[in-house]
Structure formats: C-alpha cells, structure tokens
C-alpha cells in the first residue's frame, strides 16, 4: 500500500528530522549522518522514501528540499511547533477560550 504524503511527512522521526535539517540548506550524506547521529543504511532508506515522494532531490552528492519540499516543510515545522506548545501546556490550553484564534 502506498503511503500518503501526510504519513511520509509525520510518521517517521528520522524523516521529520531530515526534512527539518534540509530547511537549513543542502547537505551531503556525511553531514546528515553526523548531525542526526544516524548510520548510512537507515537514513538512506528514509532518503529514498522522501525522494520517491518528491520531497527531496539529490544533485552532486548533496541532498536538498525539492520545490514541493520547500513549500511543505516550513508548514510542517510550524505545525510541529504548534503541537509542541499545545502538548507541553495541555492543561493550560484546554481551559482557555480560543474562539478568537
């Protein structure tokens, strides 16, 4: 069964971390492995998935966000940050009137 784009973006910590890393610009595999503290085989599996879904591209041994990735990943980052705020302060937010938001 084919994964949805939503699944590809959010269901793997490795993929999320890689996409967020590539927001800072193109990286080679050694930079990716070092920054994310991962081995080649597991991260290459995730890279292939992201490339298959046209979220990243490779050129001259550098991986970078594709045009689609450049649109989606900043929005993904914002959503993740929002989830993090709401999750950390759940008791506070559950009792607030947020209808004006």
Which residues are covered by each model-predicted region?
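Amphipathic alpha-helical dimerization/coiled-coil segments
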Residues: 77-101
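Glycine-centered, phosphate/nucleic-acid-interacting loop/turn motifs that mediate DNA/RNA or nucleotide
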Residues: 53-54
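Short capping segments at the starts of secondary-structure elements
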Residues: 13, 24-28
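Short, Lys/Arg-enriched N-terminal segment that forms or immediately precedes the first helix
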Residues: 1-8
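Short helix-coil-helix linker/hinge
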Residues: 8-15, 69
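A short acidic, leucine-rich amphipathic alpha-helix
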Residues: 31-35
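Short, hydrophobic-biased segments on the C-terminal half of alpha helices
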Residues: 47-48
């Amino acid at each position: 069964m084919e994964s949805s784009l939503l699944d590809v973006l959010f269901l793997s910590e490795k993929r999320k971390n890689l996409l967020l890393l590539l927001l800072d610009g193109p990286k080679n595999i050694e930079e990716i492995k070092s920054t994310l503290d991962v081995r080649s085989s597991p991260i290459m599996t995730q890279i292939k998935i992201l490339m298959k879904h046209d979220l990243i591209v490779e050129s001259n041994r550098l991986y970078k966000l594709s045009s689609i990735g450049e649109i989606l990943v900043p929005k993904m980052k914002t959503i993740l940050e929002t989830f993090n705020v709401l999750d950390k302060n759940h008791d506070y937010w559950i009792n607030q009137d947020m209808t004006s938001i």
